[in-house]
Design a protein with these regions (language model features):
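Terminal targeting signals and extreme-terminal segments of soluble enzymes
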Residues: 1-141
């Protein structure tokens, strides 16, 4: 098993754990008023049979980063969703690959909130190079 180095400055152990992401730990995050950036070092448990980070992991953590970023924006605007958010739709374009040992970051670059919906876009990078772009729509509950 590969040991992960310390995360980049500003990142701490991810505050939101779930049974889905438990096997992918350690996962880190960085919070601001308008977004949550999630990151991890690519390990064997993150990869497909070709040694690249699996698209399912990329999609799941992009969804997580965008949803949490929507909550950050809504909360900063005094509209913290009591019931959280539910993903309505999500599209992802895979334009590169992450390999073992790379720092993979899920950074939400755009959030627009409405009364019942929140729209977000995220970019996924591997050591700073864009490998995926995701768009999602969330229902505010």
């Amino acid at each position: 098993m590969m040991t992960s180095p310390a995360p980049p400055q500003g990142f701490e152990p991810h505050f939101r754990r779930s049974p889905l992401t438990e096997p992918w730990e350690p996962i880190y995050s960085q919070r601001t008023n308008d977004r949550v950036i999630i990151g991890l070092y690519a390990r064997d448990t993150h990869t497909n049979s070709r040694g690249m980070v699996h698209g399912g992991l990329i999609a799941a953590l992009a969804d997580n980063a965008m949803g949490l970023s929507c909550v950050q924006v809504l909360t900063a605007a005094g509209r913290k969703p009591e019931g959280g958010l539910v993903t309505v739709s999500m599209a992802i374009d895979f334009i590169g690959a992450a390999k073992l040992g790379q720092w993979v970051a899920f950074d939400t670059q755009y959030v627009k909130t409405g009364r019942t919906l929140c729209f977000a876009q995220a970019f996924v990078t591997a050591d700073g190079d864009v490998i995926a772009r995701a768009d999602a729509k969330f229902r505010v509950t």
